[in-house]
Amino acid sequence: MDNGDRSGAGAGAVGSAGSLGLRVGQAVFSSASLLFMSVGVEFFSYTAFCFLVTIMGLVIPWSCTLAMIDVYSVFVGCPLRVPGVMVIVVVGDCALSIVSFAAACSSAAVIDLLLQLHGSHSSPTFCGRYQLSAMMAFLSWLLMAASATFNLWFVASRW
């Protein structure tokens, strides 16, 4: 499976340039989601928003750590191929993908409810920020799901 990647790994598997791009995107979108949600001090009033902040706070260090591993693997040319470590990465990616999707969906549902109430419980400025936060969370989830899929595919193809 040679796709022009120096590491010889799959297109988005840990240790490839594709994985580095996915991880950087995850960190950027998660940080943006956290920033947009944290700008409004009213988010503590809603459990779904607190859940989103917590999950995005977990995704950022996970993605940054794996991005550093990818940088090392891409530039040094020493890919991460230890099966036990790859299984941990796959399990972590899958778990964070599921909970980030749940957080994004629950936040979007609460935002929709707040907008249907015509802003009587929240100002339109905060609702706009919350919408941006949920959108960034969905984009982060999309990249996280892609990483989980690529890494699962890589692990399954090695055994």
From Swiss-Prot:
InterPro entries found in the cross-reference section: CASP_dom, CASPL-5
Topological domains annotated Cytoplasmic: 1-6, 70-94, 156-159
Extracellular side: 30-48, 118-134
TM ranges: 7-29, 49-69, 95-117, 135-155
Pfam family membership, one: CASP_dom
Keywords of the record: Cell membrane, Membrane, Transmembrane, Transmembrane helix
GO cellular component, one term: membrane
Main subcellular localisation: membrane
Annotated membrane topology: Multi-pass membrane protein
Compartments reported by the entry: Cell membrane
Record has Cell membrane as a keyword: yes
The protein's assembly and partners: Homodimer and heterodimers.
Family, per entry: Belongs to the Casparian strip membrane proteins (CASP) family.
PANTHER family: CASP-LIKE PROTEIN 5B3 (PTHR32021), CASP-LIKE PROTEIN 5C1 (PTHR32021:SF30)
Identification of the protein by name: CASP-like protein 5C1
Source organism (scientific name): Zea mays
